């Protein structure tokens, strides 16, 4: 059985423009949220990635008419039916858990396979379950491969999340939009994607206040109508291209960004010494690489701190620094599966998954055969391949396609010597 690989001959400097897609982490929540609407919904600005296709297929399993055309999705829920969702689709996609909250909100009942996605170590959904129970749901976890969630009635509740969780904040919000009374989520996630989902639900007629703060208030409504909605730009894709530009960009303009959403990365790149100009009015950044950078320390935090999803993509830049850099991963301490692959390329890097720390020293990279263990590790290896001398072959590229629209095509257009092969 053959598989597609990405090959990169490093050493090229890149130049040109790239336009950022809609936010993956918004899209994977908003697509399930469409099933709460009674009527037709049109979403614009979707990223063209495999996760979107999987979620559209899950909508179709509920007898929803869903037409995906490029960046636009049209959904008609008029003939929706509740049905168990198949494991083979659900287990491939972590964000399929948003179907739980949406189906609970719509039907007060769902049977769904246990979600999959990138292997980043423990990512329990206990906070989601806690929220569903507070709203009045009963959870049957007796089956090893699926979960049954059911409520006679959904009622508002005060819910304090034990840890800040984007997934739990959104999932509880989806389940609560039709609950009787008011639901208050304390210690809610503040990420732009949470705000985007709340704005979408409000466009359908929901009553949600406080999105973007640590306290979310949801006043239940009887029904939601259709709407047309534009998804925000993807701050992680934007950040990845900012790292690419800082690594190998003669001059790269990155269009369709929200400067506030990438502020933590922008500050860190400037600390490194990157030549970066951000134009908030035009929603773009212009970046020119330098031959060497200053060493820095990076600590991942919940928004508005440095995003865990950019910890891996920024790592290759640290090999260009003039001294050792230190990374502390506070969100997913096991998010260092890219380290051994970088070592195969000659990198001087050590990581400790128990403490969630890594030490990165100046290194020259050489092409090698490497394996993308997850989505952002794949982005890291692409940047490393662009920097390396010789040819780098990246396996498991399906992870990369889960989160980056046409990344090989975009890099070719910028001047990279990059291609795909079947092996």
Curated annotation (Swiss-Prot):
GO terms for molecular function: UDP-N-acetylglucosamine 1-carboxyvinyltransferase activity. One of its GO terms (cellular component) is cytoplasm. The modification 2-(S-cysteinyl)pyruvic acid O-phosphothioketal is found at residue 118. The keyword Cell division applies. UDP-N-acetyl-alpha-D-glucosamine binds at residues 94, 123-127, 309, 331. The active site is at residue 118. It is an enzyme of class 2 (transferase). The keyword Cytoplasm applies. One of its GO terms (biological process) is peptidoglycan biosynthetic process. Phosphoenolpyruvate binds at residues 24-25. CDD domains: UdpNAET (cd01555). Keywords: Cell cycle, Cell division, Cell shape, Cell wall biogenesis/degradation, Cytoplasm, Peptidoglycan synthesis, Pyruvate, Transferase. It is found in: Cytoplasm. Belongs to the EPSP synthase family. MurA subfamily. HAMAP family: MurA. This is UDP-N-acetylglucosamine 1-carboxyvinyltransferase 1. It comes from Staphylococcus haemolyticus (strain JCSC1435). The lineage of its organism: Bacteria, Bacillati, Bacillota, Bacilli, Bacillales.
């Amino acid at each position: 059985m053959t598989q597609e690989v990405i090959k990169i001959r490093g050493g090229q400097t890149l130049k040109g423009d790239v336009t950022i897609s809609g936010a993956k982490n918004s899209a994977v929540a908003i697509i399930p949220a469409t099933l709460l609407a009674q009527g037709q919904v049109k979403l614009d600005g979707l990223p063209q990635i495999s996760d979107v296709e999987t979620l559209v297929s899950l909508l179709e399993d509920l007898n929803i008419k869903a037409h995906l055309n490029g960046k636009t999705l049209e959904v008609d829920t008029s003939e929706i039916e509740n049905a168990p969702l198949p494991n083979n689709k659900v287990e491939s996609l972590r964000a399929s858990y948003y179907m739980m909250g949406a189906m609970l909100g719509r039907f007060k009942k769902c049977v769904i396979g246990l979600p999959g996605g990138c292997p980043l170590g423990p990512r329990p959904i206990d906070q989601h379950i806690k929220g569903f129970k507070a709203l009045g749901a009963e959870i049957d976890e007796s089956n090893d491969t699926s979960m049954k969630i059911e409520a006679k009635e959904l009622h508002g509740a005060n819910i304090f999340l034990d840890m800040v969780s984007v997934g739990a904040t959104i999932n509880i919000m989806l389940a609560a939009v039709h609950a009787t009374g008011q639901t208050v989520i304390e210690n809610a996630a503040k990420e732009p994607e949470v705000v985007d989902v709340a704005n979408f639900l409000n466009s359908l007629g929901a009553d949600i206040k406080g999105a973007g703060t640590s306290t979310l208030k949801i006043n239940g409504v009887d029904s939601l109508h259709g709407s047309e909605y534009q998804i925000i730009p993807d701050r992680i894709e934007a950040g990845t291209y900012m790292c690419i530009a800082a690594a190998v960009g003669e001059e790269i303009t990155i269009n369709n960004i929200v400067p506030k959403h990438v502020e933590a990365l922008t500050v860190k790149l400037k600390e490194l010494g990157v030549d970066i100009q951000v134009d908030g009015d035009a929603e773009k950044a212009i970046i020119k690489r330098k031959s060497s950078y200053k060493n820095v320390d990076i600590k991942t935090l919940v928004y508005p701190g440095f995003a865990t999803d950019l910890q891996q993509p920024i790592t290759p830049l640290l090999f260009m620094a003039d001294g050792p850099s230190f990374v502390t991963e506070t969100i997913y301490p096991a998010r260092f599966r890219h380290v051994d692959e970088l070592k195969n390329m000659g990198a001087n890097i050590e990581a400790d998954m128990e403490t969630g720390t890594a030490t990165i020293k100046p290194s020259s990279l050489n092409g090698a055969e490497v394996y993308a263990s997850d989505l952002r590790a794949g982005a890291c290896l692409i940047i490393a391949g662009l920097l390396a001398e010789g040819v780098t072959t990246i396996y498991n590229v399906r992870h990369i396609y889960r989160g980056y629209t046409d990344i090989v095509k975009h890099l070719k257009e910028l001047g990279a010597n990059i291609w795909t092969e079947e092996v």
